[in-house]
């Protein structure tokens, strides 16, 4: 652990550097410290912090910048989230205070709001679908070989997919299959629709001479409804953190955040990784070296979970440069996760 003075100096350097993005010298630190300390003392303490691996010296300046270890110490022991300004509060309330037709629309808007407010890349995943129940399934013929499968759940979401059947299936056959499927599925939660239940439905369909392709499209639309949808906004902001023109890296980074499975793994929230200081923050921060891809070595990922009661939990996240102003960003995520949860609870309340 550091002495109280060393902690003050480290915190001052990090807060100044994340605002100016310029190396911080001893005179700047001396002028910003809340206690009177000589420039020589500050220089000596900065040298100690550098020896401990918490500060780094740049080639172009006599000032210091935080190292990854310095940021981690700051995040674990020193940070105090900042309350968001009234203007930001008003913008969040305004953008969320409009009618939405589906949960996914709210979650998608959440990612956009966070990206607009921060100029970083933002992610948002909706509440888990484990408790969501099926309220109806339909198949609508579009042509002699093409149909649309529609699955409706009790949270107001509608999933639909278009399928091409290998042979003509008449309307009466489709209606019989739909009635049988609804008898088996309506009122069931998505998480309870397992292979055993689907096999029972398949046996009934085969016994009645229904096309086996109907079961395939049912499985596809259920899988789609149960899968976690991750919304991303502000991908272009990733480019601002690249100082060179390495197009290969940029393309790989874009590909990484365009893969839903990779994103779910990256954004996955672990309560044990919440900030360990006294701020009681529910925001998790991972620095570049702590992230699973070398492409993210100059980035930090801030993740927060929000709860919508019995409807489950969702996740919001920000991906930005390591030298971001953490106090402001953590304060923003803390407030935003609560506002998003309230908006979703209001939405779900319409279906009681």
UniProtKB/Swiss-Prot annotation:
Keyword Transcription regulation: yes
Biological-process GO terms, alphabetical: negative regulation of DNA-templated transcription
Entries under Pfam families matching the protein: HrcA
Residue stretches in coiled coil: none
Molecular function terms, GO-annotated: DNA binding
InterPro entries: GAF-like_dom_sf, HrcA, HrcA_C, WH-like_DNA-bd_sf, WH_DNA-bd_sf, WHTH_transcript_rep_HrcA_IDD
Protein keywords: Repressor, Stress response, Transcription, Transcription regulation
Biological function: Negative regulator of class I heat shock genes (grpE-dnaK-dnaJ and groELS operons). Prevents heat-shock induction of these operons.
Stated family: Belongs to the HrcA family.
Name of protein: Heat-inducible transcription repressor HrcA
Lineage: Bacteria, Bacillati, Bacillota, Bacilli, Lactobacillales
């Amino acid at each position: 652990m550091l002495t109280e003075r060393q902690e003050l100096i480290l915190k001052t350097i990090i807060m100044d550097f994340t605002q100016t993005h310029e190396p911080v010298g001893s005179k700047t630190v001396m002028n910003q410290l809340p206690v009177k300390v000589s420039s020589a003392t500050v220089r000596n303490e900065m040298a100690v912090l550098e020896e401990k691996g918490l500060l780094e010296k740049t080639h172009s300046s006599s000032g210091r910048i935080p190292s990854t270890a310095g940021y981690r110490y700051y995040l674990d022991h020193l940070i105090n989230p900042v309350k968001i300004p009234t203007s930001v509060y008003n913008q969040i309330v305004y953008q969320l205070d409009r009618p939405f037709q589906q949960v996914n629309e709210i979650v998608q808007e959440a990612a956009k709001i966070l990206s607009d407010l921060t100029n970083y890349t933002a992610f948002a995943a909706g509440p888990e679908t484990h408790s969501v129940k099926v309220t109806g399934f339909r198949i609508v013929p579009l042509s002699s070989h093409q149909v649309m499968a529609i699955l409706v759940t009790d949270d107001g979401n509608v999933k639909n997919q278009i399928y091409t059947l290998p042979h003509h299936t008449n309307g009466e056959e489709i209606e019989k299959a739909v009635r049988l499927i609804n008898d088996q599925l309506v009122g069931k939660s998505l998480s309870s629709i397992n292979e055993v239940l689907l096999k029972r439905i398949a046996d009934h369909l085969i016994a009645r001479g229904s096309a086996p392709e109907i079961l395939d499209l049912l499985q596809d639309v259920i899988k789609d409804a149960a899968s976690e949808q991750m919304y991303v906004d502000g991908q272009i902001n990733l480019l601002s953190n690249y100082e060179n023109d390495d197009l290969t890296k940029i393309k790989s980074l874009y590909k990484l955040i365009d893969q839903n499975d990779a994103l779910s793994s990256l954004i996955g929230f672990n309560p044990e990784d919440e900030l360990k200081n006294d701020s009681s923050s529910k925001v998790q921060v991972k620095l570049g070296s702590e992230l699973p891809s070398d492409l993210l070595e100059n980035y930090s990922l801030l993740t927060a979970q929000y709860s919508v009661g019995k409807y489950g939990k969702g996740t919001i996240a920000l991906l930005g440069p390591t030298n971001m102003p953490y106090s402001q960003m953590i304060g923003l995520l803390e407030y935003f996760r609560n506002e998003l949860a309230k908006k979703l609870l209001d939405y779900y309340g319409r279906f009681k």
